[in-house]
Amino acid sequence: MDILSKKKFTEINSGKFGITKKIVRKIFKKSILNSTIKGKQLIHSFPINFYIDNKKITDKPIGQICEKFGISCFNLMVDRFCFEALDNCYKKKKISVKGFFDSGVASSISSLTNSEKNQGSVCIDIGSSSSKVVVYLKNKIVYVANIPIGGNDVTLDISKGLEISPESAELAKIIYGTLNLPFNEKIEIDLDSNEKKLISKNLLYGIIKPRYEEILEIIRDNLFDNLYARIGINSIVLTGGASKIFGLENLSEHIFNRKSRIGRIERPDSFFHNKPEFSTLLGLIELAKNYNKYDFATEYLNNKFLTIYDRVENWIEDSYA
């Protein structure tokens, strides 16, 4: 499902008695209601900055005195037809969906540290058919993209290059795949016919590395077209199933000219330790645990005013208590 990201600026008259939590609630609700686009469904709305009389930018508006009070939000939207079709699939099975979340945002929440989010980092989740890119700057999401290229493209290259099935190619990629030049040793690849194919490991390397270079270069070019992303990024965190290949950190540092690491759970006793393919799942768990914090836009747009009021209230209390 394609993601549309769009910044939205909203402004209200605040009077001359100082900004209160009530005014913050008012402007954020107005921002959500004014963010509707025909044919699109809003799934996330992240506050970026508050504006005092169109000049001063602040993260802490409570108590500030001004006549005009503004807010800029970073909104994520999806195609409404696809959204409703997916929602109806669950309803037919009598499954009630509490909320929809962007998988790239979920991966970034589980993979990035608070320090990385503050200093400026990008989380790149390389999946099977797409790569999800999320940029944080000063603890705020400033860029999101979903690029239709991923690990399956590598598998298909191997399948065509070695004239083997995609299943055998995927297995060869997992077992023998590397982005560092290997010794010119011979390896055996299991075929579907219970036979084996003997090839040079260098041949496999020669197929895999160019495709990974292309994937990262496409991501880099899309990323650096955005001024915030190009200037603010200090580090790269790679996650997703296709990030497990040996040597990806070094290749990423070469292409992005930024410090790179593979996203992982730091607890060695955890089942998810060194398993970046579970980053989206772990992020979704975190999102579900903090549902009030991350998702109130959808229910507000569906006219569930009491619920959204409570959620915005919780967000304001947590942020500006």
Regions found by a protein language model. Give the residues of each.
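Gly/Thr-rich phosphate-binding beta-strand-loop-beta motif of the actin/hexokinase/Hsp70
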Residues: 1, 112-144, 158, 284
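Nucleotide/phosphate-binding catalytic cleft detector across ATP-hydrolyzing
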Residues: 1-121, 142, 165-166, 177-208, ...
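Residue-level signature of catalytic and energy-coupling elements of molecular machines
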Residues: 90, 158, 219, 238, ...
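Short, solvent-exposed amphipathic alpha-helical segments in soluble enzyme
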Residues: 116, 224, 251-257
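A conserved active-site cap/scaffold subdomain adjacent to cofactor or substrate pockets
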Residues: 148-170
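Glycine-rich phosphate-binding loops at beta-strand->alpha-helix junctions
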Residues: 177-180, 231-255
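Phosphate/pyrophosphate-binding loops at sites that engage ATP/ADP/AMP, CoA/4′-phosphopantetheine
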Residues: 216, 220-235
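Conserved phosphate-binding/catalytic loops in two-lobed NTP-binding clefts
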Residues: 255-282
